[in-house]
Design a protein with these regions (language model features):
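Nucleotidyltransferase catalytic core that binds NTPs
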Residues: 1-160
Length: 160
């Protein structure tokens, strides 16, 4: 079965990678959909995010990466993907995820939720971006494969 893991991945975290590893073990094909919201600003370009996910999942041959600016349900219909996978870190994620699940289900797309390991419950792209801006340690919350890219971003931001 082909599944979609949608998100902004700005940048990818160890939580994202843990979910991808679990999904890759269960499904034939996992597409990471980097969705662009024109109303949001991002620290990394779509191309940078695609490359980071590619690097972090190089050992997972069933994981593919795509970039789109439309609706997740429309992407699923176009690509004949019947199932979304989403991560739940804690109770704070539930209201949005419940609303999104209902919206997608009404459009014929089911959602499977994966709960984060307790050690990853506080890991978020928001926290990674904060640490990048503050010049703080990153290795405990991001895949090692993308550390050089993130450290370069830290240097670039300090130089501004």
């Amino acid at each position: 079965m082909h599944v979609l893991f949608p998100g902004s991945f700005d940048p990818p975290t160890l939580g994202h990678l843990a979910l991808l590893r679990r999904a890759a073990a269960l499904f034939d094909r996992v597409t990471v959909g980097i969705f662009i919201n024109p109303d949001k600003s991002y620290l990394f370009t779509p191309e940078e995010r695609r490359e980071m996910i590619r690097l972090a999942t190089a050992d997972l041959p069933s994981v593919f990466v795509d970039v789109d600016s439309g609706y997740v349900a429309d992407y699923c219909k176009r690509n004949e993907i019947p199932l979304l996978i989403r991560g739940i870190r804690g109770d704070g994620d539930l209201p949005f995820e419940k609303m999104a699940e209902e919206y997608n289900r009404e459009r014929g797309i089911e959602t499977l939720f994966f709960f984060s390991a307790p050690t990853l419950a506080d890991v978020s792209s928001t926290e990674v971006r904060r640490r990048i801006r503050e010049g703080e340690e990153l290795s405990s919350i991001v895949p090692a494969e993308i550390l050089p890219i993130l450290r370069q971003k830290q240097k670039d931001l300090r130089a501004e």
